[in-house]
Amino acid sequence: MSLIERLEGELREAMRARDDDRRDALRLLLSSLRGAEKELQRPLHDDEELQVLQRERKRRIEAAEAFRAGGRAEQADAEEAELRVLAEFMPEQLDEEELEEIVDSAIAEVGATSMRDFGRVMADVMPQVSGRADGSVVSQLVREKLA
């Protein structure tokens, strides 16, 4: 079952349950995925679907932070509610320990000793953590390890 089919099923359930917040969040996700399909003029692959979800996740986080900074807690809460719905369809995020293990093994594998090797380490780590860790968190961890 594709992600779009799962989202459509969840949307039907949310409509039956009259869960307006969940329904709206699912509609936004479906709209983003369908927009990406139309842009590419073909069905999305799993990794492309994941990229769309990650992009939407990042947008929700940034919007919630901006609303909080602007003193608009109600809109920030709405964005965070959408983020919780979106998280249900994303792969489980790596915890700090697992991410550190992956980074440490990549540093050892590449033979990195300084910040000059940052790009090579990131190139080794990112395919392993794709969709399961935020790139900025990975980047920060690699910088700390190489410093």
State each model region's role.
Residues 1-147:
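Charged, compositionally biased, marginally structured helical/coil segments
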